[in-house]
Amino acid sequence: MGEEGTGGTVHLLCLAASSGVPLFCRSSRGGAPARQQLPFSVIGSLNGVHMFGQNLEVQLSSARTENTTVVWKSFHDSITLIVLSSEVGISELRLERLLQMVFGAMVLLVGLEELTNIRNVERLKKDLRASYCLIDSFLGDSELIGDLTQCVDCVIPPEGSLLQEALSGFAEAAGTTFVSLVVSGRVVAATEGWWRLGTPEAVLLPWLVGSLPPQTARDYPVYLPHGSPTVPHRLLTLTLLPSLELCLLCGPSPPLSQLYPQLLERWWQPLLDPLRACLPLGPRALPSGFPLHTDILGLLLLHLELKRCLFTVEPLGDKEPSPEQRRRLLRNFYTLVTSTHFPPEPGPPEKTEDEVYQAQLPRACYLVLGTEEPGTGVRLVALQLGLRRLLLLLSPQSPTHGLRSLATHTLHALTPLL
């Protein structure tokens, strides 16, 4: 695992599985969208070798060359997605989850029926353009991490109980149980109904809102890949402050005119100060003044059962490495930890006493990057205790022998928040 490069070049291909007709190709270079397209001969070869394997009942899932990693994945025997990445050391786990998110985004905005029963390829190509903005945000250098962790990116507001109370009252007045408050693609607060949304829509909906151009109000048709992949719902968004939006998931009612501006002003005008306090939480995730050790350059906290996470690289933001490098380091460390050190452990529904005891024992792993000179490089530590997993990026001044103690103390401090 390393931090080489700036993310490399990524090409994403989407093809109709039966015919091999390309539906779209999206690319990024160094974390930014790129116009570069792969030659049709290369696209045909990549799809051809995958189909050749299928005809022999061999599942081709990934391949590596000297400077490129390729991952293939088919969905419902109808759509084939292929991703190529030149990023040094990128993991297959990360690319597989990228493809899952991309297909989820396609279902979210087009619907599963259109993707599994392709009647008109040209029309489908046109319909899929609506998903480009969301898909491109997965390929870029995002400040979010839910695409990789499959957990909802969250922030902790200073006056959470006040916002939660207003959110519940507003939801009841609006006649829906699915309401959330979102800042820069991260959930600030949500109703119980919203938290019960399945994966991947729980991750995709706030990400979609964060990827769209600013707008005072929206009435957006969406499908729920897990909960309602063939029947559309309405996603209503109302901007309270710049980058802070109220999101409602509902059926034919209520009309947008019923919510804006009368109902909106009634519930949220008195809370302008608590709402303004949410604005800096986008990149920071934690309330101002939350006590973090001065060696912490970034952190990722996951609640594995609730499927929520806190992710920030804001502490000591004026020091090296840059925020982009910090995000890349934590992303790479997450894939290493998830695939190697803390893999999923499927088990029977009822656990024995010994298994419950083992689950409560903390597990940790450490990684030190940099030269042998003291005070250079960075330290990474992961600690899992029960249903929570914490990953820390630490400055080179942090002593290696104190990593576990620092991680344990930080996890205990963060536990009441998530």
Curated annotation (Swiss-Prot):
Official protein name in the record: Protein fuzzy homolog
Species of the source: Homo sapiens
Family according to the record: Belongs to the fuzzy family.
Subunit structure: Component of the CPLANE (ciliogenesis and planar polarity effectors) complex, composed of INTU, FUZ and WDPCP. Interacts with CPLANE2. Interacts with CPLANE1.
Subcellular location: Cytoplasm; Cytoplasm, Cytoskeleton; Cytoplasm, Cytoskeleton, Cilium basal body
An annotated Gene Ontology molecular function: phosphatidylinositol binding
UniProt-listed InterPro entries: FUZ/MON1/HPS1_longin_1 (IPR043972), FUZ/MON1/HPS1_longin_2 (IPR043971), FUZ/MON1/HPS1_longin_3 (IPR043970), Fuzzy (IPR026069)
A single cellular component GO annotation: cilium
UniProtKB keywords: Cell projection, Cilium biogenesis/degradation, Cytoplasm, Cytoskeleton, Developmental protein, Protein transport, Transport
Highest rank taxon of the organism: Eukaryota
Role this protein plays: Probable planar cell polarity effector involved in cilium biogenesis. May regulate protein and membrane transport to the cilium. Proposed to function as core component of the CPLANE (ciliogenesis and planar polarity effectors) complex involved in the recruitment of peripheral IFT-A proteins to basal bodies. May regulate the morphogenesis of hair follicles which depends on functional primary cilia. Binds phosphatidylinositol 3-phosphate with highest affinity, followed by phosphatidylinositol 4-phosphate and phosphatidylinositol 5-phosphate.
Cleavable signal peptide: none
GO process annotations (BP): cilium assembly; embryonic body morphogenesis; embryonic skeletal system morphogenesis; establishment of planar polarity; hair follicle development; intraciliary transport; negative regulation of canonical Wnt signaling pathway; negative regulation of cell migration
The keyword DNA-binding is assigned to this record: no
Keyword Coiled coil: no
